[in-house]
Amino acid sequence: MERLRIIRESRGSYVIQVYGEDHTLGTLLVEAIKRVSNPKLAYYEAVHPMEDIIQVYVKYEDDVDIKEVLRKASDYLLEVIGDFRRRYLEALERRGGGG
């Protein structure tokens, strides 16, 4: 089963369907897309409450390389999560390893 499907609706307008995910990734992905590119509009919605499918809608002034935008957004999220992990582990170490 595919995990991701990109649909170009019209010039500069894309729908990214993500299977097996929910609001957690939807919120993170939209915010990351906004950070790494300059969309006119970016939001997501759950397809149905009983299905783990989200659709991310992104609109730009003109066509973009949406795969490159998603790569940059993924890199950004990995960087943020890595930074959080590093800070968390440093804090644990300062407290003597307890959590």
From Swiss-Prot:
The keyword Transferase belongs to this UniProt entry's keyword annotation: yes
Alphabetical UniProt keywords: Cytoplasm, DNA-directed RNA polymerase, Nucleotidyltransferase, Transcription, Transferase
Function of the protein: DNA-dependent RNA polymerase (RNAP) catalyzes the transcription of DNA into RNA using the four ribonucleoside triphosphates as substrates.
Subcellular location: Cytoplasm
InterPro entries: RBP11-like, RBP11-like_dimer, RNA_pol_Rpb11_13-16kDa_CS, Rpo11-like
CDD domains tied to this protein: RNAP_L
Subunit organization: Part of the RNA polymerase complex.
Gene field: rpo11
Entry's Gene Ontology cellular component terms: cytoplasm; DNA-directed RNA polymerase complex
Molecular functions per Gene Ontology: DNA binding; DNA-directed RNA polymerase activity; protein dimerization activity
Highest taxon in the source lineage: Archaea
Organism name: Aeropyrum pernix (strain ATCC 700893 / DSM 11879 / JCM 9820 / NBRC 100138 / K1)
Protein name: DNA-directed RNA polymerase subunit Rpo11
BP GO annotations: DNA-templated transcription
Enzyme Commission code: 2.7.7.6
EC main group: transferase
Catalytic activity: RNA(n) + a ribonucleoside 5'-triphosphate = RNA(n+1) + diphosphate
Similarity field: Belongs to the archaeal Rpo11/eukaryotic RPB11/RPC19 RNA polymerase subunit family.
